[in-house]
Amino acid sequence: MSRGLGDVYKRQIIGDEAVPAHNTTPESIEIHQSFAKMVDAGCKAVVMEVSSQGLKLDRTAGIMFDIGVFTNLEPDHIGPNEHESFEDYLNCKAKLFKQCKVGIVNADDKHTKDILRGAICKVESYGIGDNADIKAENIELLHEPGKIGLTYDCTGLVNMKVELNLPGKFSVYNSLCAIAITRHFDVDEEALKETLKHVKVKGRIELVKVSDDFTLMIDYAHNAMALESILTTLKEYHPHRLVCLFGCGGNRSKERRYEMGEVSGKLADLTIITSDNPRFEEPEAIIEDIKTGIAKTTGKHVDITDRKEAIKYAIEHGEPGDIIVLAGKGHEDYQEIKGVKYPMDERVLIKEVLEELKGN
């Protein structure tokens, strides 16, 4: 089935063509122009990420979605350039369920009831708790060289054994969400199980082979909630050391810097603070804010402003059994400095570092 896609990677996929986009959720006229192109390309379904900003600015007004999905919510995107308060953020998210036919929601998230207040759609839920319509039971971790994953039993509206080559409770939730959605498309169970077993998403717990001794991965975790989630998950696999490398974006809330610093300081054995997208701020000033959060903990840290040098330090000092997380950039292939997006892909940086270390 031909499909269309609009997502956080700021791209649109129309049939087999990938088209760059400026926003996660484009302006309304662009959305409908894209829909028209998708119809012309023979697309039968569209999967679209609808951001809180997109809902706030009515970019999706007039669209009735067949399925709307709510995964989770924590304070984020709050500031002078985004939402004035968490209440505004939540209320904007909730607008989605006033313009969809079926709402699929995470039964375990503490904000689900508020998100569904005023909803006009039929509601189905997924989760780990007993009150979910589709739930995961008997979760078991899988860990062997070059592989971090888990298995669980899916029960309720869908019953099957699930295996994932991805770690963590959040991967359980993500897969349950996918199962809940695909139920409405009559997807073959064996095809679904095989897809879940091998699914990989660029920049999301993306394993990169650098050594036979330790594990390195790239992940888009760019706020405290996401960082805490992945670090807590990885600690369950009992690494020799958990090493976290990250920075924070410029011209965004300083609270995020303090919170991420504190989270990494508490959970990681070593934090390597570096640059992310400094935008119009000085990278060193952002690093100092992150260190303010780390100072609330007893966590060890080093700060290396240049991201490539920081990655080199992480690889060069990797110890047997370590898990190293490069957090924050994920799928991004640029670094934004003073209004200019310079090419920068962590996969390329890793390759360059390995070549340099090999040459030495």
Q: Which residues fall in each region the model found?
A:
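Inter-motif core of Ras-like GTPase G domains
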Residues: 62-72, 239-244
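Acidic, Mg2+-coordinating active-site environments of NTP-dependent enzymes
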Residues: 39-43, 66-216, 291-298
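Single conserved hydrophobic/aromatic residue that forms the stacking wall/gate
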Residues: 1-9, 271
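ATP-dependent carboxylate-amine ligase
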Residues: 120, 157, 177-190, 194, ...
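N-terminal phosphate/diphosphate-binding loop that engages ATP/GTP or pyrophosphate donors
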Residues: 6-23
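Conserved nucleotide-sensing/catalytic segment adjacent to the nucleotide-binding pocket
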Residues: 19-48
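Conserved helix/coil segment N-terminal to the catalytic DExD/H
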Residues: 54-61
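Switch II (G3) loop of P-loop NTPases
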Residues: 43-53, 216-222
